[in-house]
């Protein structure tokens, strides 16, 4: 069994648009204790099976976990097939890298199942062909990702704290958000301050340095996401931000009693609210 933890962004910046149409990004990310679970079983025939109970997630080649298995098998010339059982706990299209972390878990799991023993850096390079968050998710923990998300540099973990996630009942297409980017109008986060705060393990400096260049775009399309962020701060979160392209908003709190109060308060705004520890 392979755990596939969700990620949150502590900083997300978009630097420029490349000739291939994609954007170069700079993202500081860490993992939280909200995880999908992946079980892998070797099959004698050359096939890939996906088993999961979710009407929102495809179980064919559109699934990133399927694509990860196909790429791994091709790269390392694996003749056998594999059955991938996915227990979904991370919301879909939520800005928490649910699909990417599943793909990363498949790469790690197949590496062990078939005794390939490839180093994580090789798996991360493979994963970068699947999506911008997959390389980070191969490593997990805390890191800064640059370029298309394929240049990974590990960072110190944030101090222990609680994370409240709140997600409205909408899905946000990352592609749609990136298509609406006007670089000259973006509010760029101070990534350097986030990095300095992580080096010092300064919780409150991390909280006041959070920044996401995509927030204003998502807020314009879905004002309820902005309302959730404001509600999170008004309820007492030390810091709050939208993760990824949204719509999930997270709040950071050091003490459980306060986190519990904020969790209960946010239940009045949306049904999908979680209270978890930071993993980092």
Swiss-Prot record:
Reactions accelerated catalytically: 4-CDP-2-C-methyl-D-erythritol + ATP = 4-CDP-2-C-methyl-D-erythritol 2-phosphate + ADP + H(+)
Coiled-coil features, chain-numbered ranges: none
Transmembrane segments: none
Sorted UniProt keywords: ATP-binding, Isoprene biosynthesis, Kinase, Nucleotide-binding, Transferase
UniProt-annotated binding residues for ATP: 91-101
Molecular-function annotations in GO: 4-(cytidine 5'-diphospho)-2-C-methyl-D-erythritol kinase activity; ATP binding
The organism's place on the tree of life at top rank: Bacteria
EC number of the protein: 2.7.1.148
GO BP annotations, alphabetical order: isopentenyl diphosphate biosynthetic process, methylerythritol 4-phosphate pathway; terpenoid biosynthetic process
Pathway named in the protein's UniProt entry: Isoprenoid biosynthesis; isopentenyl diphosphate biosynthesis via DXP pathway; isopentenyl diphosphate from 1-deoxy-D-xylulose 5-phosphate: step 3/6
Enzyme class: transferase
Pfam families hit by this protein: GHMP_kinases_C, GHMP_kinases_N
Disulfide bonds: none
Record-linked InterPro entries: GHMP_kinase_C_dom, GHMP_kinase_C_sf, GHMP_kinase_N_dom, IspE, Ribosomal_Su5_D2-typ_SF, Ribsml_uS5_D2-typ_fold_subgr
Function: Catalyzes the phosphorylation of the position 2 hydroxy group of 4-diphosphocytidyl-2C-methyl-D-erythritol.
Family label: Belongs to the GHMP kinase family. IspE subfamily.
Name this protein carries in UniProt: 4-diphosphocytidyl-2-C-methyl-D-erythritol kinase
């Amino acid at each position: 069994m392979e755990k596939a933890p969700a990620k949150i962004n502590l900083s997300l910046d978009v630097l420029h648009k490349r000739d291939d149409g994609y954007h170069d990004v700079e993202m500081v990310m860490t993992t939280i204790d909200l995880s999908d679970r992946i079980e892998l079983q070797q099959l004698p025939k050359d096939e890939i099976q996906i088993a999961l109970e979710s009407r929102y997630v495809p179980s064919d080649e559109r699934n990133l976990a399927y694509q990860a298995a196909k790429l791994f098998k091709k790269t390392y010339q694996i003749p056998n097939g594999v059955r991938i059982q996915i227990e979904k706990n991370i919301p879909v299209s939520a800005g928490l890298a649910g699909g990417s972390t599943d793909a990363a878990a498949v790469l790690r799991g197949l590496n062990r199942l078939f005794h390939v023993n490839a180093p994580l850096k090789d798996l991360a390079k493979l994963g970068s062909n699947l999506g911008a968050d997959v390389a980070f998710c191969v490593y997990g923990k805390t890191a800064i990702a640059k370029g298309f998300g394929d240049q990974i540099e590990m960072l110190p973990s944030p101090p222990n704290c609680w994370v409240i996630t709140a997600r409205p009942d909408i899905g946000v297409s990352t592609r749609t958000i990136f298509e609406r980017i006007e670089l000259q109008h973006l509010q760029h986060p101070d990534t350097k301050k986030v990095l300095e705060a992580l080096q010092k393990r300064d919780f409150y400096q991390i909280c006041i340095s959070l920044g996401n260049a995509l927030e204003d775009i998502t807020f314009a399309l879905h004002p309820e996401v902005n309302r959730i962020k404001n509600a999170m701060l008004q309820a007492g979160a030390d810091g709050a931000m939208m993760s990824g392209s949204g719509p999930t908003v997270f709040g950071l709190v050091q003490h459980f009693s306060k986190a519990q109060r904020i969790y209960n308060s946010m239940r009045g705004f949306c049904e999908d609210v979680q209270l978890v520890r930071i993993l980092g």
